[in-house]
Amino acid sequence: MDVGSKEVLMESPPDYTAVPGGRLLIPCCPVNIKRLLIVVVVVVLVVVVIVGALLMGLHMSQKHTEMVLEMSITGPEAQQRLALSERVGTTATFSIGSTGTVVYDYQRLLIAYKPAPGTCCYIMKMAPQNIPSLEALTRKLQNFQAKPQVPSSKLGQEQGHDAGSAFSGDLAFLGRTVSTLCGEVPLYYT
């Protein structure tokens, strides 16, 4: 071993001091790449925070919508569900909570109401200029059901049937939607 190599080992160790100025030094990277890397990391963090906030808002909105829908379905107030038939604009069907179903037939100018127990069906004529709203119709039908009177005329009486018999004729003149709703129960014209 020669003496020169021992001197190298005997030198004092290098100083390990803090980075001057508090800067982050990434070895073997030029300054412009370091700046670009810092900008990219900041932009990615901002995007992640924004996307997270949007997803939380969407989740809260979805939960609120589901809660409102569930309350409207199971709630005591009237549920008004509109279902149009194959011929758009000719019939509209409304389910009025647990009290019954109303069908507006705009082609035949008829309104059919079947109470929830399904013991009878009421048919009304409507004027094309004065179509009653669902609220007005519901009030009228609830008042009509509250009275213990006999319905004004049974739909078989006009053809010579007595008041106690059920009308067993062809219901095609009522249309498919009203016939489906009222086909198996006595019909009353109000």
From Swiss-Prot:
It is found in: Secreted, Extracellular space, Surface film. PROSITE patterns: BRICHOS, SURFACT_PALMITOYL. InterPro entries: BRICHOS_dom, SP-C, SP-C_palmitoylation_site, Surfactant_protein_propep. Its main location: secreted. GO terms for cellular component: alveolar lamellar body; extracellular space. Keywords: Disulfide bond, Gaseous exchange, Lipoprotein, Palmitate, Secreted, Surface film. Residues 94-190 form the BRICHOS domain. One of its GO terms (biological process) is respiratory gaseous exchange by respiratory system. Disulfide bonds join 121-182. A lipid is attached at residues 28-29 (S-palmitoyl cysteine). Residues 1-24, 59-190 form a propeptide. Pulmonary surfactant consists of 90% lipid and 10% protein. There are 4 surfactant-associated proteins: 2 collagenous, carbohydrate-binding glycoproteins (SP-A and SP-D) and 2 small hydrophobic proteins (SP-B and SP-C). Pulmonary surfactant associated proteins promote alveolar stability by lowering the surface tension at the air-liquid interface in the peripheral air spaces. This is Surfactant protein C. The gene is SFTPC.
